[in-house]
């Protein structure tokens, strides 16, 4: 295989505390990275880099791991601009919310949906995202949910079955019947196309008992749990996530002390989604409280047409630092290694020998600029699995 060295990196974020300055980011100054095929095979000081077939001079710019976006909803059609405009104008809007997207998604062709996913993922890639999870949840029939997962699987191997996004409009008068569908025929059709199962555990969606039944059924089919938890109100979602060893509890906006302690002591990652609070003018999650309790925190976009229509992880990093109590170091770790932890992956989110060669070259000397210069397109080059893709 051809080897490539990226040299003269001003600041390299490895996410290996044993390297560099000994912090969680494992920062190495004046660094180099060697790529062989799809893997990283060497990191260290630029002056000590081994000979390679190709050399790229970073010219004093920073390199960070590819961003890991562990929560998105990309298989959809249409948009919800009217809803957003009404919300930002302080006007009531009752035209359907998620149901609006469900109707548009059901009406779209496979080709239209796949093209939409490809477009949003290309948009994210240009901003440094090299790993992305995405969900179903805008079909809410057996056929449409399975179709969404098949389409998602063309673009990523981190696919989540979210038949339990809301109760389908077709079952508005029979929510128990819809839970039976989600845990029965829909699960049978969807399980072969997904790695994960998710549920929106919230007032107006699924209560704790329903969420438990859905996640337990999915686990019996080999799908690992994730959960939308405690976004709009206090509720049982976080405690259920920890109890069921869910990989991630997502949103985590309204937390009791017991919720925070459970996340601090368990293996479930608290995935924070600042784009949702930004887009809805809602209360910000308290990242500082979680971090101080010892919780593992991930940052993700929650890219979706209703409450967080952004594919930009750098934007979410800036929000987390400005409004959620995170330091720049904590935010970059959460958007890379934290996202990897939320997907229970050890091959991504870091720049160390053996990891997948996912790198982002910034047009800046330090990762801090991602928060320091919000809205500025700082991504200069992106490698995914050893291939330069931007």
Curated annotation (Swiss-Prot):
Zn(2+) binds at residues 71, 73, 228, 302. The keyword Iron applies. 4-imidazolone-5-propanoate binds at residues 80, 138, 165, 231, 307. GO terms for biological process: L-histidine catabolic process to glutamate and formamide; L-histidine catabolic process to glutamate and formate. N-formimidoyl-L-glutamate binds at residues 138, 304, 306. Pathway: Amino-acid degradation; L-histidine degradation into L-glutamate; N-formimidoyl-L-glutamate from L-histidine: step 3/3. It comes from the Bacteria. One of its GO terms (molecular function) is iron ion binding. GO terms for cellular component: cytoplasm. Its cofactor is Zn(2+); Fe(3+). CDD domains: Imidazolone-5PH. The keyword Zinc applies. Gene3D superfamilies: Metal-dependent hydrolases, Urease, subunit C, domain 1. InterPro entries: Amidohydro-rel, HutI, Metal-dep_hydrolase_composite, Metal_Hydrolase. Keywords: Cytoplasm, Histidine metabolism, Hydrolase, Iron, Metal-binding, Zinc. It catalyses: 4-imidazolone-5-propanoate + H2O = N-formimidoyl-L-glutamate. Its EC number is 3.5.2.7. It is found in: Cytoplasm. Binds 1 zinc or iron ion per subunit. Fe(3+) binds at residues 71, 73, 228, 302. Belongs to the metallo-dependent hydrolases superfamily. HutI family. Catalyzes the hydrolytic cleavage of the carbon-nitrogen bond in imidazolone-5-propanoate to yield N-formimidoyl-L-glutamate. It is the third step in the universal histidine degradation pathway. HAMAP family: HutI (MF_00372). PANTHER family: IMIDAZOLONEPROPIONASE, IMIDAZOLONEPROPIONASE-RELATED. This is Imidazolonepropionase. The gene is hutI.
